[in-house]
UniProtKB/Swiss-Prot annotation:
Location(s) in or outside the cell: Cytoplasm
Cofactor(s) listed in the protein's UniProt record: Mg(2+)
Originating organism: Corynebacterium efficiens (strain DSM 44549 / YS-314 / AJ 12310 / JCM 11189 / NBRC 100395)
Family statement drawn from the similarity comment of this UniProt entry: Belongs to the phosphofructokinase type A (PFKA) family. Mixed-substrate PFK group III subfamily.
Binding of substrate, residues: 129-131, 166, 173-175, 226, 270, 276-279
Name this protein carries in UniProt: ATP-dependent 6-phosphofructokinase
GO cellular component, one term: 6-phosphofructokinase complex
Catalytic machinery residues: 131 (proton acceptor)
Pathway: Carbohydrate degradation; glycolysis; D-glyceraldehyde 3-phosphate and glycerone phosphate from D-glucose: step 3/4
PROSITE patterns from the UniProt entry: PHOSPHOFRUCTOKINASE
Amino acid sequence: MGAMRIATLTSGGDCPGLNAVIRGIVRTASNEFGSTVVGYQDGWEGLLADRRVQLYDDEDIDRILLRGGTILGTGRLHPDKFRAGIDQVKANLADAGIDALIPIGGEGTLKGAKWLADNGIPVVGVPKTIDNDVNGTDFTFGFDSAVSVATDAIDRLHTTAESHNRVMIVEVMGRHVGWIALHAGMAGGAHYTVIPEVPFDISEICKRMERRFQMGEKYGIIVVAEGALPKEGTMELREGEVDQFGHKTFTGIGQQIADEVHRRLGHDVRTTVLGHIQRGGTPTAFDRVLATRYGVRAARACHEGQFNTVVALKGERIRMISFDEAVGTLKKVPMERWVTAQAMFG
């Protein structure tokens, strides 16, 4: 295809690397094909409201490689509101002369992108999530940065926990999958890690911590994914709230585990919830490179007519996969990875 007018947007939670994708799209579209790129602001809401800006291949675009967050802004939109606005979306894209749309986001965003593709809009999706739970791709950008933040926090908590003879609970993001907890726990030398894929036994956690204290190691580090749940009947949880999209909020599982460990063992137990700090800041070198490669490949896919696809990392190569492969199921931590992590507990 010749020169095109491409639109892009960022939707869902922010993460390091979004700007690197935008930069990759703009520079590739402009330099290789003479195309122009438009950015819709604040995700799907901006597309529905026709809030758009022209993105130029200039010094401003060049500088965003280092920046966290997204220059376009982001947001979440209820699927029902989005689907009800399909006619408006089509009209806005037509009025702006858009030939292709590149949505950048996680599972929910990619489901929305698939729905647009099913309704005749030329779409190329770019997977984004710090959780690393998008199926069909080995890694999503933002994950490495989040793991680095969590690992740094664990490194720092080792010294304060040891100084005060404490058990430290570190709660990290991961509503349905435990990739951040698993990787940060291994990299940070945690003494136990709890992930959503494997229901935990509070008695086993307490046993591990008590064994450490008996052996003279007067502190412990436990990493907990926010979506972790206990084995049925082993621990009673306090109910979480439900957000505007019907999702139960899991923040607080770390404190609940801390309370139970303290009740059973009597040790001083403190909780650190990393929360949104995992989303912020400068992307790691790995995420900058991966996000740039995603942006370049997405722009090229548009000009090659490879629509209704998603860019993905397979081994060392960036490939195009179907929306069905990307959004069919979540990519969860395999049991063999969990077994490997267990060998480091204690």
